[in-house]
């Protein structure tokens, strides 16, 4: 959306875009597919299982290079994602875990479903002007985007990094978009601040109370990279106070 706003020639609506924040985002699958080493290093798979994941990942990368994005997605889905495949994913079979948004949890917290009823209340419907429209959870949208998921948007991100404030953040406990995978992707972006970012010091970020470490930050120019401690894929759910502090600093800083 941000790239479309940036490149619009005669937009119907003028949007004063100032920046974007990307949280645990699949930006460039080809450089973010190293699940084998990550899962091995956090102890969720052994060396044999890691070897299987590595081989499957290489096949998916080749499909991406060949423009076979749907085939690449099917490997990703069977390996970890588990949204489309009928049987459990390989990750589920070898780890026993149903939840890949936080490696400290084995199952999805029931609290994650509470919002469904809340957003459909009359008060919320009125506040967000949706009338009696049916609430959808996104599954139908995903089904229509299967061929797009494995496509890279790194070239678009590069353009945005040269023109706007950009923050990319990851929860330390996320599996499906793990921090090392994002860091690897960032290292491959060809932008004007790349060399400076390589040498940029990593700074400690404290919680609002100053009593604990919220995470770590690296910043060069208008680009900020953040690792958030004690959080997984769903940062506002795991660490709401820290999430608010982070986004407030980004907007107002």
Model-predicted segments: where are they?
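Terminal and linker regions of secretory-pathway proteins
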Residues: 1-253
